[in-house]
Regions:
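Cys/His-rich metal-coordination motifs, chiefly Zn-binding "fingers/knuckles"
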Residues: 283-322
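Hydrophobic, membrane-interfacing alpha helices
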Residues: 1-286
Length: 322
C-alpha cells in the first residue's frame, strides 16, 4: 500500500494518479487503433467526445449501483463509493447509443466500433486496479498462503481485519486488486496479439470473460461491497448482467435474437456505404429515398441476410408509404 507518491514538494494520491494514467492509456489506445483502422480525423474526434460522455455515464451508474447495494445492506439510504461492473453496465449502452446518433459514419456498426476501443478500456482498468492496491481498497479475505499481503494500520484492510496478535496492521489478506489487474493485462495482450481476428468481437469477449472472472473473484474478496436481495454479491449480480449481455451480442450477430433490429442495422450499414445517410430529407426526395431503401433491401436479400418473404414484406411496407 502506498497512498501517496511523495515528491518532496508535493504529495500525489496514488489512486488518483493511476486513474489518470488509465484514462491516458485509453485515449492513446483509441487514437492508435482508430488510425490503424483508417478512420478519418472527424470520426476519431467524435469518438473522443462520445467516450467523454460515456465515462460520465459510467461514473454516475457506478455510483448509483454502489449506493443501492450499500443501502440494501444497512437497511437505509446511503450514498458513496463506486463499482466498476455497475459503471460498465451503464457506459456500454451509452457508448453504443451515442455512437449511433453522433457518429453517423459508424451507423449500423455501433457494437463493432465499440469493440475497437475495448482494449483501451481493459488496459485503463488494469491501471485502476493497481491504484486500488496502492490505495488499500478492494482487498481480499484473510489468508495464510504466501500470497497474503499485510496492509498498514489505518488502512481499510486493517480496519476490517485488524491484526489482534501483533496489534499492528492487518492480518495477511489476498491482493485481489492485483489478481484483477493481472487478468486485465493478460486480456489486453490477447486482444492485441489476436487483433486482426477478433477486433470486431472484443465487446462480447470482454463482457463474458470479465463477467466470469469477476464472478469467481468475488468469492475471494473481503471488503464490504453492499448486498443484494439474492444469495449472490452485488458484483456477482452485475457480472451476470455482463455475461448475459455478451451472450446476447453473439446470438444477435448470428441473427438469432432481435432480428428486426439486426435488419435495421444491416440496412443502416448499407446506407453508410452508399452515403444515403447524407441524403436530403425534403418531401420531394422522400419517394426517391424509399426506392433507394428498397434497392438496399434487395441487396440484403441477395446476400442471404433476408429471406424472400422478409424482403417482400418490407418492400410492401415501404411502397405503402409512397
Amino acid at each position: 500500500m502506498l497512498p501517496f507518491f511523495d515528491l518532496g514538494f508535493i504529495k500525489i494520491p496514488s489512486y488518483s494518479l493511476m486513474l489518470v494514467l488509465g484514462v491516458i492509456a485509453y485515449v492513446i489506445n483509441l487514437l492508435v487503433v482508430l488510425k490503424k483502422e483508417g478512420k478519418e480525423p472527424p470520426v476519431i474526434n467524435k469518438a473522443l467526445t462520445v467516450s467523454l460522455f460515456a465515462f460520465a455515464v459510467m461514473g454516475i451508474t457506478a455510483f448509483i449501483f454502489d449506493s443501492i447495494f450499500h443501502s440494501i445492506e444497512v437497511g437505509y439510504l446511503v450514498f458513496g463509493g463506486i463499482t466498476w461492473a455497475g459503471g460498465v453496465v451503464g457506459s456500454f449502452p451509452a457508448f453504443v447509443i451515442l455512437t449511433h446518433y453522433f457518429i453517423k459514419e459508424e451507423r449500423g456498426s455501433e457494437i463493432e466500433f465499440f469493440s475497437l476501443v475495448v482494449p483501451g478500456i481493459v488496459l485503463g482498468h488494469a491501471f485502476g486496479r493497481i491504484g486500488c492496491f496502492l490505495g488499500g481498497c478492494c482487498f481480499g479475505g484473510v489468508t495464510e498462503s504466501c500470497l497474503g499481503v499485510v496492509f498498514p494500520t489505518g488502512s481499510p484492510a486493517a480496519q476490517t481485519y485488524p491484526n489482534t496478535i501483533t496489534g499492528e496492521g492487518s492480518f495477511p489478506v489476498l491482493p485481489t486488486q492485483l489478481f484483477e489487474a493481472g487478468f486485465e493485462l493478460l486480456l489486453y495482450l490477447f486482444m492485441i496479439i489476436f487483433r486482426k481476428k477478433f477486433k470486431y468481437n472484443n465487446a462480447e469477449i470482454y463482457l463474458i470473460s470479465y463477467g466470469i472472472f469477476r464472478f469467481i473473484l468475488e468469492f475471494l474478496r473481503g471488503d464490504s461491497r453492499g448486498a443484494t436481495c439474492f444469495f449472490i454479491s452485488p458484483s456477482q449480480f452485475l457480472s451476470l448482467i455482463l455475461i448475459i449481455t455478451g451472450v446476447l451480442i453473439i446470438l444477435f450477430k448470428k441473427r438469432l435474437v432481435f432480428t428486426s433490429l439486426y435488419d435495421k442495422l444491416s440496412l443502416w450499414r448499407e446506407q453508410v456505404k452508399t452515403g444515403v445517410y447524407d441524403a436530403p430529407q425534403s418531401v420531394e426526395s422522400k419517394n426517391a429515398e424509399i426506392y433507394k431503401e428498397i434497392e438496399l433491401l434487395h441487396g440484403l436479400y441477395q446476400k442471404g441476410i433476408l429471406t424472400e418473404e422478409e424482403y417482400q414484406s418490407k418492400k410492401a411496407e415501404l411502397l405503402n408509404k409512397i
